From Swiss-Prot:
<keyword id="KW-1003">Cell membrane</keyword>
<keyword id="KW-0813">Transport</keyword>
<comment type="function">
    <text>Probably part of an ABC transporter complex. Responsible for energy coupling to the transport system.</text>
</comment>
<dbReference type="Pfam" id="PF12558">
    <property type="entry name" value="DUF3744"/>
</dbReference>
<dbReference type="GO" id="GO:0043190">
    <property type="term" value="C:ATP-binding cassette (ABC) transporter complex"/>
</dbReference>
<dbReference type="InterPro" id="IPR027417">
    <property type="entry name" value="P-loop_NTPase"/>
</dbReference>
<dbReference type="InterPro" id="IPR022216">
    <property type="entry name" value="ABC_Co_transporter"/>
</dbReference>
<keyword id="KW-0547">Nucleotide-binding</keyword>
<keyword id="KW-1278">Translocase</keyword>
<feature type="domain" description="ABC transporter 2">
    <location>
        <begin position="304"/>
        <end position="537"/>
    </location>
</feature>
<dbReference type="InterPro" id="IPR003439">
    <property type="entry name" value="ABC_transporter-like_ATP-bd"/>
</dbReference>
<dbReference type="InterPro" id="IPR017871">
    <property type="entry name" value="ABC_transporter-like_CS"/>
</dbReference>
<dbReference type="Pfam" id="PF00005">
    <property type="entry name" value="ABC_tran"/>
</dbReference>
<protein>
    <recommendedName>
        <fullName>Putative ABC transporter ATP-binding protein SACOL2708</fullName>
        <ecNumber>7.-.-.-</ecNumber>
    </recommendedName>
</protein>
<dbReference type="InterPro" id="IPR015856">
    <property type="entry name" value="ABC_transpr_CbiO/EcfA_su"/>
</dbReference>
<dbReference type="InterPro" id="IPR050095">
    <property type="entry name" value="ECF_ABC_transporter_ATP-bd"/>
</dbReference>
<comment type="similarity">
    <text>Belongs to the ABC transporter superfamily.</text>
</comment>
Length: 570
């Protein structure tokens, strides 16, 4: 019988700063060549599990270990980080933290340079893997000239050059647009087939990541593995709900249509599922018997008006925003989508006054252009995509209280507001923690809390749900809905097709700095041309409709949205 390449035996790990173990009594074997998906809610222990494998624990991050861990038949606790790096390669979630070269080529060649590889061989290796990861045309580009997805591919190429038998990817989809995320998963599958390496992908976005190419799924909850099974069997069980992870939308739709999912052989393969005549009959019957009217209406009173707004970063570059015409209406929840580099974040920064613009911005029929950043912040709050670019305090409480203190509010009033927001964002238990101890997703919630506590008229959130598990996703979105009901206008820049379709009444699509669509979310996702231009990817509901043969897929999507909202309100 094949020996496992990774073996945990009664393994537990506890950080020095915490009162209880983050990993508890882990027993699992992973075999050479397996492709394993590791999922779990934020703080469930999945990243700690990965860091125990790659050696960041205990060689960089200290803590108490009990039990045994063997990597490639070696006791993992007595080797060193250098030796471990020859066996395990890791692509981090935060690509900025992993990019160390001045160009893409230099970054990919870093290991080869340190191993004194001949320059000709070095160039051949870099070119070979750059071709494999789709970066051959970008080898001379600086990191600041690359998108998040491109940086990720550079990091992957640098790891593949080392040809480690184990490859770990931590949240590879977190900062990518849907189409790029789909391409990344396809790339990883091709690499797995070619290299036969053991591949471990840590992710919580099941809609995008889970398919039947995974040999197994490890599901974490509260530091324990509560499921170790095939993708299909996991989807049939109740374990995802127990762990606070959202199942793929098509699985929920099948249940709404009263399909017995436990009787389906390969539930992880949507095409196979939809070949069943019974499934086709049940779904079509559900559509015919249920109204799919769209009750989302945005208000007619403009709050913010952008007229021919342009942004150009230098005299020699093309416009990042090009004659943008856009109205934002009072009390609406607006989603802004588009490919990486489309100008979404630039648009938000232009509204906030971070960038020089040409054109005109009006707020409540008043000129906005002449207001300073500080003055605009009274009306508009902005949560950036990367939390590390916003955080300036060491402690969580102090970070959330920072803006209120700058405005001179009494400390007693600050305490009430800060603690209320921390509870809503699921951070109250960590209020006295150092920010350095938080995961990327938890840091994201801290930055959201630091803006929500200021109570601005308009709240702009750049990827508000990136890195969030389903539980905290719902917590944050429920809070934003409540703010919206109280009269706040919410603008969400997102790659999340769930958020787009379920929580926004209107969607603006950007491509190459221009508005290419401004309509309802369902109509955006039903337009294949718009999806292609903006690097969007239709959800599994659209794929289901096409496989089943439904002539108007938007009916199924709108029906699901309406029905799901009713279920969540109950």
């Amino acid at each position: 019988m094949t020996e496992p390449i990774i073996s945990f035996k009664d393994f537990s790990f506890q950080y020095h700063s915490q009162a209880t173990p983050t990993l508890q009594n882990i027993n699992v074997d992973i075999y050479p060549g397996e492709k394993v998906l590791v999922v779990g809610a934020s703080g469930s222990g999945k990243s700690t599990f990965a860091n125990c494998i790659n050696g960041l624990i205990p060689f960089k991050t200290k803590g108490n270990i009990t039990g045994e861990l063997y990597i490639n038949n070696q006791d993992a606790t007595v080797s060193c980080l250098h030796d471990r790096s020859n066996v395990v390669g890791t692509v981090l979630q935060d690509t900025d933290g992993q990019f160390i070269g001045l160009t893409a080529a230099e970054d990919m060649a870093f290991l080869l340079e340190n191993n004194c590889v001949e320059q000709d061989d070095m160039k051949k290796n870099v070119s070979y893997w750059a071709e494999k990861v789709g970066m051959i045309e970008h080898l001379n580009h600086r990191p600041q000239d690359l998108s998040g997805g491109q940086k990720q591919r550079v990091s992957l190429g640098g790891i593949l050059i080392h040809r480690t038998p184990i490859l770990i990817l931590d949240e590879p989809l977190a900062n990518l647009d849907p189409a790029t995320g789909h391409e990344t998963l396809r790339l990883l599958n091709n690499i797995h087939e070619e290299t036969k390496s053991t591949m471990i992908i840590v992710e919580h976005r099941l809609e995008e990541s889970l398919d039947d190419t995974f040999d197994r799924v490890l599901l974490f909850k509260d530091g324990k593995i509560i499921a170790n099974t095939t993708p299909s069997d996991l989807l049939k069980s109740s374990k995802l709900k127990e762990a606070g992870i959202r199942e793929p939308l098509y699985c929920t739709a099948l249940k709404y249509a009263e399909v017995d999912v436990e009787s389906i052989d390969n539930l992880a393969n949507l095409r196979d599922v939809c070949m069943s005549e019974h499934v086709k009959f049940k779904v079509k019957k559900w559509i015919d018997e249920t109204s799919a009217n769209n009750d989302n209406k945005y208000k007619s009173e403009p709050l913010l008006e952008l007229n021919e707004v342009c942004v150009q970063y230098s005299d020699y570059s093309n416009s990042v925003l090009n004659n943008v015409q856009l109205n934002v209406y009072r009390r609406e929840m607006l989603s802004i989508v588009g490919h990486n580099g489309a100008g979404k974040s630039t648009l938000a920064k232009a509204i906030c006054g971070f960038l020089d613009i040409t054109g005109n911005i009006q707020f409540c029929n008043r000129g906005f252009n002449q207001l300073s950043i500080s003055e605009r912040s009274e009306f508009v709050g902005y949560v950036m995509q990367n939390p590390n670019h916003m955080i300036s305090e060491k402690m969580i409480y102090d970070e959330v209280a920072l803006g209120l203190r700058a405005r001179g509010m009494k400390e007693s009033d600050i305490k009430i507001r800060v603690e209320n927001v921390l509870k809503i964002c699921g951070l109250y238990a960590f209020r006295n923690w150092p920010i350095a101890a938080l995961s990327y997703g938890q840091k994201k919630r801290v930055t959201i809390a630091s803006v929500l506590v200021l109570n601005p008229e308009i709240i702009i959130l750049d990827e508000p749900t990136a890195g969030q598990d389903f539980y905290h996703y719902n917590e944050i979105m429920s809070f934003l809905i409540e703010l919206n009901r109280q009269g706040k206008t919410i603008i969400m820049i997102t790659h999340d097709m769930h958020l787009l379709s379920e929580y926004s009444s209107r969607t603006v699509v950007l491509s190459k700095g221009q508005v290419v669509a401004d309509t309802t979310p369902v109509l955006v996702l039903n337009d294949k041309k718009i999806c292609e231009i903006a690097s969007l990817r239709q959800t599994s509901l659209f794929e289901m409709a096409e496989y089943i043969g439904i002539s108007e897929p938007q009916k199924l999507v709108q029906l699901f949205i309406n029905h799901d909202r009713k279920v969540r309100r109950q």
